[in-house]
């Protein structure tokens, strides 16, 4: 009887350790985001990517940065298939997930911050078909770009505040009477 009770207690203890141990959780929202500034992971099925929807997304996201004398895309777009969207890519700093399904009634764009990493912007574009979603994304292109650009600016400001230059920040304050953190790079 004692032996059976001891075996049950050990199994319960081991089970609790496995469930509670953070090593078995692949994603935590406290993890640092990966990726370079202005880099975007687009999670999109091949059929949607080679359609009007994919062309629309590329035209919006890869449009040239204004006021530059040579072509430079607004975002470096990396498209991956949904089945390849796993732990490392889920922690990217900018993610756009494209979901096309006849079960979806109306097209929509949804934004979530710090979904699987910090700092992160996680956007879901969904619609009933490629054509309808392409139209919706095109009509809301300014909102899409605003969210992505603002996230990048906010990250840069946060970095500058966290790691101000020890030589430049006091110099700017002395010369212009403005206290503003300036990063070294």
Region annotations inferred by a language model:
Residues 21-185:
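N-terminal targeting sequences that direct proteins away from the cytosol to non-cytosolic compartments
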Residues 1-31:
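Bacterial Sec-dependent N-terminal signal peptides
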